[in-house]
């Protein structure tokens, strides 16, 4: 392994631990729920992911699992079973370098009460949701670790791309969101905007006066000015 790759891997290990601690401290995950993976750059590829049943708030860089591009573990403690799903996301969304899964309270609550639509779990309430998040379809309930989730998510990514839309997140019924992006920072920004929009939507429903979505004209303006994927 080159010195450059070693330095990059060491940096990404620290980044995963920082992101996990931030998510834990802010209540996006609890106990041993949730997961984060990152894709290593370069021809060798590979991934870093926390060990199975790890608490994201207390990750240790040296214990993260290093898995090669073929899915074989090379070092660290036993990789989380979530990697199967994350690898499919990376395969079908090559622009992604990070995938985050949480059990965010507002989003899980939304699936328990009933999402806005199966194709869009929340309506486009704000311009930043349209610009930074975009469509978020619902994945039907499967038990944790079921391989059918990976197949379902891959199909959703592909069908949206065929329509000229970039998917950045899906919502697993009763479990939580899977969100991906070009970096841990970008991925967390999508997650935060999605959770906040779910909170706004549920609060408006609880008030008895649901907020109207942005108009089609307003969304078209966001497409024209910011290339919003909606």
What are these regions (language model features)?
Residues 1-230:
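Glycine-rich flexible loops
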């Amino acid at each position: 392994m080159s010195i450059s790759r070693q330095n990059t891997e060491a940096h990404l290990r620290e980044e995963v631990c920082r992101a996990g601690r931030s998510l834990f401290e802010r209540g996006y995950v609890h106990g041993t729920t949730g997961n984060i993976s990152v894709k290593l750059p370069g021809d060798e590829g590979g991934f870093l992911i926390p060990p199975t049943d790890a608490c994201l708030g207390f990750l240790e860089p040296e214990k993260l699992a290093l898995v090669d591009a073929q899915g074989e573990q090379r070092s660290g403690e036993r990789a989380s079973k979530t990697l199967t799903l994350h690898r499919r996301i990376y395969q079908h969304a090559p622009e992604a370098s990070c995938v985050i899964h949480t059990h965010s309270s507002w989003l899980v609550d939304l699936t328990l009460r009933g999402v806005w639509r199966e194709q869009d779990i929340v309506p486009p309430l704000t311009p930043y949701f349209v610009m930074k998040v975009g469509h978020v379809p619902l994945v039907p309930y499967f038990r944790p670790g079921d391989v059918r989730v990976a197949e379902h998510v891959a199909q959703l990514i592909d069908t949206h791309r065929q329509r000229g839309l970039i998917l950045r997140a899906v919502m697993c019924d009763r479990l939580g969101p899977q969100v991906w992006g070009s970096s841990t920072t970008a991925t967390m920004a999508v997650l935060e905007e999605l959770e906040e929009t779910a909170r706004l939507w549920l609060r408006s429903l609880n008030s008895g006066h649901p907020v109207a979505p942005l108009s089609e004209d307003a969304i078209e303006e966001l497409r024209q000015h910011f290339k919003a994927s909606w």
